[in-house]
Amino acid sequence: MSPLTETKAGTGFKAGVKDYRLTYYTPEYETKDTDILAAFRMTPQPGVPPEEAGAAVAAESSTGTWTTVWTDGLTSLDRYKGRCYDIEPVAGEDNQYIAYVAYPLDLFEEVSVTNLFTSIVGNVFGFKALRALRLEDLRIPPAYSKTFQGPPHGIQVERDKLNKYGRPLLGCTIKPKLGLSAKNYGRAVYECLRGGLDFTKDDENVNSQPFMRWRDRFLFVAEAIFKSQAETGEIKGHYLNATAGTSEEMMKRAQFARELGVPIIMHDYLTGGFTSNTSLSHYCRDNGLLLHIHRAMHAVIDRQKNHGIHFRVLAKALRMSGGDHIHSGTVVGKLEGEREVTLGFVDLLRDDYIEKDRSRGIYFTQDWVSMPGVLPVASGGIHVWHMPALTEIFGDDSVLQFGGGTLGHPWGNAPGAVANRVALEACVQARNEGRDLARQGNDIIREACKWSPELAAACEVWKEIKFEFETIDTL
């Protein structure tokens, strides 16, 4: 045998393949305050012990590979390796387990959600020993979260900028989402803002298409904002989507929005990417722009119960990367969202400190320290009859966004906006008077209809509209 390949006594290296669990399954490990903790829902292939599967997840998402390598001896694996420190069976499921993995902080670059995700979920989800794998939650320690700027401004600063307090904010996505000219688009924005909404919004797939180039849209929308502000005396905004094919083009659009003097822009953070999103967030803080975030493509990643990444993880990632608003589902509308699960990640977006609560899908206590909060945006298939439930579920620190529920009003856009504003004001007043929105919501709306013909017409149109389908992603 060549002396270059011979295994010598005492060197600690022996070529070959060994079980992951011999190195990466450490049930005796006590987690550190600085560890990043992950909860994976894993479904091993038949015949693969859960300890081996959990150890494989820890190994392949940190320092491990499929065989022993001699360069392991050139570093301290014990310092850098991920550790599967606990495994528990999932109640009611055969061959499904929650594996808890601890990662040392030194594995991750500061201020980089991109690097965090590349490490933890970048490779291991295709591992053959696993039939399915889902990242259910992450615990981000303050030692790591404090390296991030977080949201450009946060909830309180946004309220101060808008001078609006004590109620949810009202929005509307302009429809049809594609096909309008820039001038007609601006007209719809003006009518909605003039009717009483706080915000209007570009749809997530409105970028710069042949029927409406971005610069034309920005100019006509800015005119609509300033005209509606002058007539109502309220600060108004429109989420101008800066998402583009390159980061450089995205920044050019953001800069033009700032030059126009508008208050808020928008980004599709999953399709645009975390690196672009963090750059845009930093620009928004430096230049006084609010940043609305759309989660386009999220259901591809988070909707299946057994495989992918839960949205609570994507929400935490967004809070670190930066955004002042993010779409969160509605509970009552057309899009997926179980109530307790939705409220769990809404709290993770807004609050400073969130206790572990498995009944809401929260696997770890999360301390954001001083990082600003993010406003959840309820949007998708909602209308005036939903207003009491939305006000009760989401509270004041939220944006309630009605697209078809505004523009579908039989009398037009402005009356649709009036109907939503009246319904919201009625619900907030009733709540402040001590009435139960959950039980008396319909009565509150009917009473408001008596002095608002716009609301009465909206109630008549949507009185039978419901989206009653079973939620796929349950606890």
Swiss-Prot record:
Q: Which residues form the signal peptide?
A: none
Positions of the propeptide removed during maturation: 1-2
* Catalytic class of the enzyme: lyase
Identify the EC number(s).
Answer: 4.1.1.39
Q: Does the keyword Glycoprotein apply?
A: no
Cofactor(s) recorded in Swiss-Prot or TrEMBL = Mg(2+)
Family, according to the entry, reads as follows:
Belongs to the RuBisCO large chain family. Type I subfamily.
What function is annotated for this protein?
A: RuBisCO catalyzes two reactions: the carboxylation of D-ribulose 1,5-bisphosphate, the primary event in carbon dioxide fixation, as well as the oxidative fragmentation of the pentose substrate in the photorespiration process. Both reactions occur simultaneously and in competition at the same active site.
Question: Can you name this protein?
Answer: Ribulose bisphosphate carboxylase large chain
- According to the entry, what is the taxonomic lineage of the organism? Eukaryota, Viridiplantae, Streptophyta, Coleochaetophyceae, Coleochaetales
Q: Which gene encodes it?
A: rbcL
